[in-house]
């Protein structure tokens, strides 16, 4: 088919998703700044099981434990300020969490290119559907 050239964003698989998210965040955890690559994971903000896609703006590079806490509702990211939200459940459930409470309200690291920043709609979904205030 002949027509106007169009920019197409390729759909990424999980490995490609992880690679582009790692690159976007300079191989640093968006929350802790950790750079130990084997411990870093590309987290989906809107999970694939909830119709989320392997899109760079649906990803955060997180240290493995931070990823688990994000998925299990202990951590969230405010969609407008991009600040870390920490659930009171962390202290209630485990009597701990000082590392994260000390970071509460701080702006998480953003990707190197502004166009790769986390999608606000996806962050709102996570705060509304997953995060436990």
Which positions does each model-derived feature cover?
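A detector for short metal-coordination/catalytic motifs
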Residues: 2, 12, 16, 34-40, ...
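Internal active-site segments that recognize and position negatively charged phosphoryl groups
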Residues: 1-33
